[in-house]
Amino acid sequence: MLLWAVMLRCVEPIATIAAALSFKDPFVCPLHKQHAADAAKRRLAAASLSDHCAVYNAVKGWEAAVRSGGGAGDRYVHDNFLSRATLQMLQSMRRQFIDILCSAGFLPPSPAGGAPGAIMLGGSAANENSSQEDVVKAVVAAGLYPNVIAVRKHGGRPSSRPPRLSVRGIGRVELHPKSALAGMTALLQPYMVYHTLVRSSACFVHDATCVPMMALVLFGGKLVAQQAGAGGAVTLTLDGWLTVHVAADSAACVMALTQRMQHCLQAKFTTPALDVYAPSPPVSARVAQSNLPHRYGDSGFAAISRETLQLLRCSFSLARAAAAVTHGSATTEDAGSCSDDDSRATTAHLQPVQGFVTRTFQIGGGGGGSDAMDALNE
């Protein structure tokens, strides 16, 4: 998770979330104040639909309150039902994670001096996308995969009931009441990722983050592309169970980007002195006219970060638009397979990405499915 954060430039929030996953979250729930504590956590989660983002928002808000002085830090802890000792531990663990990344050459040395909090941990370049929740949540998905929850909404009309949730190999699960997402009826994304699942009277997920299909495709497991039929359509299959249908050019773009991510990480491991934040050269005219993914070798971390952000933004906006129009569509009953309705809904969400990614990744071609498939199979 931390290495993806370095690549996608959101080091401070991911280091904070990683610390909480390694230790515990800072929220407390006093007796007879459960409702107030739950409301405070939902307030910190805001519109992120993420328990993990709520943790980062809590730590960031507390640090800002402490810097303002006048006892604001103590008031913040009290008003938001937080543990000061846990917040301090998360601070310390996060600092250790950053120091390890610096020692390994993945981050530049920490700047000396300066007021505490004046510079985000890891430096400004390493946190260029730290305010982009779409990117932060995608990195959380990368770290927590394959802990994936499928979200199934009730019919085609808005419902007052929370959607049904299922995990592959386990079946139906429920969000624990302590989750900021518990009881929500409008989860815009068809999938969530989680860290802790506990079996008691039912299977309860204690912490979850809503993520789009594209985040799982980009940061999940093994991705296989297969020709889906006439017209250049391609089926992308993730780890043999999660499928999505896209246009051939879109599939070529996704496969190219995932390959470049792996190549850049391998290059960094091989050459620790490599500057991962050096500006990327412009894509050459030769590459811009080619569908071959492996010819993207002249684009480094900076281009990958920029292009991933654009693709994730598009994926999130498409899901939001679809939710606004349809008020929800069915997803998988069992996370191990996709129904016909699910496939059509997913295709409808992602087909508009074809033109977007063709422009964003500068892949030429006018819908030649066979050429794109040849590129994917190389």
Per-range role (PLM):
Residues 1-255, 259, 263:
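Second RecA-like catalytic domain
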Residues 244-378:
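A positional "C-terminalness" feature that preferentially activates on distal terminal regions of long
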